[in-house]
């Protein structure tokens, strides 16, 4: 049985780097603002990407425009959709039935829920996270980019802790790397 406080967290399998810390912060933000739907967003400076864009009007999230539906002007928007959503469960099952496949790909876009919720005066917002955490991995090139970013972050982390890395680019870490005294 669904209660008034139940929340659904939508996660895609192609975002392996999202952390518990980020998800927890997004869920706290969702509760604090008493939202009905929240989208985890990210700033992507490389405009040649396949992410949906978040259209903001008057400082508020207005809708998400999927890649195939974007105009040239919309492709310039750097605020992108990670694919992660937080939704009050009591609304989800009612509103999901309202999604139509009236788009170029004739697909049912879950992101259309944003516009549906807004039109029905529900509280909708977005929560920003780091690109590396929410970057989708759809092919070997994406995986290589994510690994490169991870290695750069780990090198910076250990350098800040005072670890000597004579040639940082030649050092590779795993997620569970522990380094003792230098």
Map each language-model feature to its residues.
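A short glycine-threonine-serine/GTX helix/turn-capping micro-motif
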Residues: 73-86, 100-104, 132
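A generic structural signal for well-ordered coil/turn residues at beta-strand boundaries
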Residues: 50, 60, 80-83, 130-131, ...
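Short, flexible, basic/aromatic active-site loop/helix in glycosyltransferases
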Residues: 57-75
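Left-handed beta-helix
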Residues: 105-182
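A general structural signal for well-ordered alpha-helical segments in protein cores
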Residues: 23, 61, 89-92, 110-111, ...
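Generic secondary-structure signature for well-ordered alpha-helical cores
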Residues: 4, 31-32, 59, 90, ...
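Conserved beta-loop-beta/alpha segment of the NTase-like Rossmann-fold superfamily
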Residues: 1-58, 82, 86-89, 94-99
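Short hydrophobic-aromatic micro-motifs
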Residues: 63, 84-87, 135-136, 165
